[in-house]
Amino acid sequence: MQNLMAGKILLVTGGTQGLGLAIAEAAAREGATGIAIVGRSAEKAERAAAAIRDRAIGGGPEGAARAESGVEVLAIAADLAAPGEAERTVTETLERFGRVDSLVNAAGATSRGTLLDTTRELLDEHLAVNLVAPFMTMQAAVLDMRRRGAPGTILNIISMAMHGGQPYLAPYTASKAGLAGLTRNAAFAHRFDRVRINGLNIGWTATPGETVTQRTFHGADADWLARAEAAQPMGKLGQPDEIADAVVFLLSERSGVVTGSIIDWDQNVPGAYDQ
């Protein structure tokens, strides 16, 4: 533990499972004072909040001290596809903690659809969750940071699919490419407010949600993960804990002046070919 988030207040959308939960847990271990996590299910959000509190203790004397001081975790149930819900998550965080130091947009819609078979409803869902919701949480968080005259950090979970993606990811790719553009636009607009905004293009990652996706859309069996990892250059898929450490670093002062960066977090290189 390096206390990279010491005393900070963090809001994580999609923070009740998978990568979002790993990010919240990493922030707790790194000394965050308050963490708000957002998910669609109130019950699941409360369970995740309890897990974050339990796991924040870590190991050794530092972990024991952290357990005694505690980390306050606010569970927020919200449907980010609905108008006004994204802004409400920031409002509730401000009501509980008084400020937002850092924001992570990790919630995402991942249903499949090609250019030809995607319905307007499916496209609207992807744009609402993957682009509009981050836009509105960023707006509300930056307004708070400017009001206080305080620096802040924002990290958007984007996707390697923003480079083009598979044909069946048309609405997902469109929404994530939009989020990448928004990330750079907002970073430039608010650099003199000392609000640093960056993004991670996440590649194929081993999460419970990915297992559901593989079974739902691709008919995967129980051995899908082992086969998938065996075919990867590094012999494994991306790991939530590893990505979470990178997110916490980018949110912290240790990442210095970096802003407007979209970092590919993957083991393949876009635009590079064997032959």
Task: Enumerate the language-model features and the residues they cover.
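Substrate-binding pocket helix/loop in short-chain dehydrogenase/reductase
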Residues: T114-L115, L122-L127, A228
